[in-house]
Regions:
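Short, solvent-exposed mixed-charge patches
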Residues: 219-220
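Short aromatic-centered micro-motifs
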Residues: 204
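Extracytoplasmic low-complexity/disordered linkers and repeat tracts associated with LysM-containing
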Residues: 1-156, 160-163, 172-186, 192-197, ...
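Short, surface-exposed ligand- or partner-binding patches at beta-edge/loop junctions that are enriched
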Residues: 201
């Protein structure tokens, strides 16, 4: 059975989230496919974005005027620099220079990214049980736990204000929240989603939204 790891069912009608044990602002945003910055703004939460058990968080469904203005500025900047995507769909060096992405494991991609049909918000990479999983870039661990249904033992790493990466279905987590990690540093060990299904579920999220990791990872 392919690993789909769509995460918890996204409830379009959900307007609030009550903080559970183990939640972080980043994991809450990840659960609902939202930008953590918008949730922070909607709830007047400042860095380092501490949330509390049973706290009721408003889920930002629309951007505030300030966020919209910031988005427009970013869009104008991108327009001036061009989209920066090559013919094969990968980012040009100028667009990906800020984050030097690397493959978290060396295995073959067995299930690709798709947001239609049987949704897969990342890629599933074949591996060996207990194989080391490396961080795809420098960053800070913002979630390490098993509180998101469909992901098993999950690690989320923040690489910038816009980009997060996620590593799911692990046998073991080797980092804790707040740890700074270097590109390639081992963060977990590959687990299994069922018999003969030893693989890593890997995602890249930009402003809270899942993106095809193959756009960012180096070709091989």
């Amino acid at each position: 059975v392919p690993v789909r790891a769509a995460g918890e069912r996204s409830t379009g009608a959900a307007k609030h989230h009550v903080v559970r044990k183990g939640d972080t602002l980043y994991s809450v945003a990840f659960r609902y496919g939202l930008d953590y910055k918008l949730i922070a703004e909607a709830n007047n939460i400042d860095p380092p974005y501490t949330i509390y058990l049973n706290q009721k968080l408003a889920l930002a469904k629309t951007k505030s005027r300030r966020a919209v203005q910031a988005t427009k500025l970013r869009q104008k900047t991108v327009t001036r620099k061009s989209a920066g995507v090559t013919k094969n769909g990968r980012l040009s060096k100028s667009q990906s220079a800020k984050i030097n992405w690397r493959w978290p494991v060396d295995g073959v991609v067995v299930n690709g990214f798709t947001l239609s049909g049987k949704v897969n918000k990342g890629v599933d990479i074949r591996g060996r049980l207990g194989e080391s999983v490396g961080s795809a870039a420098d960053g800070v661990v913002v979630y390490a736990g098993s509180g998101l249904r469909g992901y098993g033992k999950l690690v989320i790493v923040k690489h910038s204000d816009r980009f997060l990466s996620a590593y799911g279905h692990n046998q073991a987590i080797l980092v804790k929240e707040g740890d700074k990690v270097k590109s390639g540093q081992v963060v977990a060990k590959i687990g299994s989603s069922g018999p003969n299904h030893e693989m890593l579920h890997f995602e890249i999220r930009k402003n809270g939204k899942p993106e095809d990791p193959l756009i960012y990872l180096p070709s091989r």
